[in-house]
Amino acid sequence: LKTDSAERKVPVYCLLKTDEYQLFHNHVVEQRLLNQENLYLFRNWNENSKLNKHTVTTPFRMIMNELFKTHDYSFHSFRHTAANHLSVLLNCDYAPLIKNLTDYTEEQYQSIRTELLRHTHGQNHWFMIAHLLGHIDPTETFKSYIHLSYLIAGHKILQSHPDIDTK
């Protein structure tokens, strides 16, 4: 954790696919069965200390370097991807955007929306994403993470003005 306020609850049960959730759940159960006070979900072997950032980033970079001749991918890229997937998922209809930009099925899309949102429309969508990223409000989230806002805005405009030619 960067700061004490960085600790938050993330509803992984609805965000992960069934097989992903099962692996995650098994890891959590395994950690609890060790009967040790674990302050960190992922920690150094036989220690109760947080992982050094290079424990994950170095192997990730090596794998990406093997897969791609040139790239700009970093482990932090997953954070951007998650923020953008959630922004589209919470603010757009399933077809065509969610169907074409993510690997979520329509059933998973509905389940995530039902679990995360109390209302079907509103600013709470952006505050939800900001909270999951550890931001107090959506300002930093939009400034640094939401790269698909124009796409989402275009989708919303088309919804409110169906007479606009989409070609």
Describe every region a protein language model picked out.
Residues P11-D72, S77-C92:
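Active-site/catalytic core of tyrosine-dependent DNA strand-transfer enzymes
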Residues Y21, K69, N91-A95, P138, ...:
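A generic secondary-structure boundary signal that marks alpha-helix termini
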Residues T3, D72-H76, A95-I98, T141-F142, ...:
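Extended hydrophobic-aromatic, low-complexity segments
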Residues Y73, A83-L86, L90-G134:
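Active-site-proximal segment of tyrosine recombinases
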Residues E47-S49, Y109-W126, L132-T166:
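Catalytic-site neighborhood detector that most strongly recognizes the C-terminal catalytic loop/helix
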Residues K2-C14:
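DNA breakage-rejoining catalytic core of tyrosine-based enzymes
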Residues L1-T3, E20, Y40-W45, I63, ...:
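Extended charged low-complexity segments that act as oligomerization/scaffolding linkers
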Residues F24-H27, I98, Y145:
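Structured alpha-helical bundle/scaffold domains in large eukaryotic membrane-trafficking regulators
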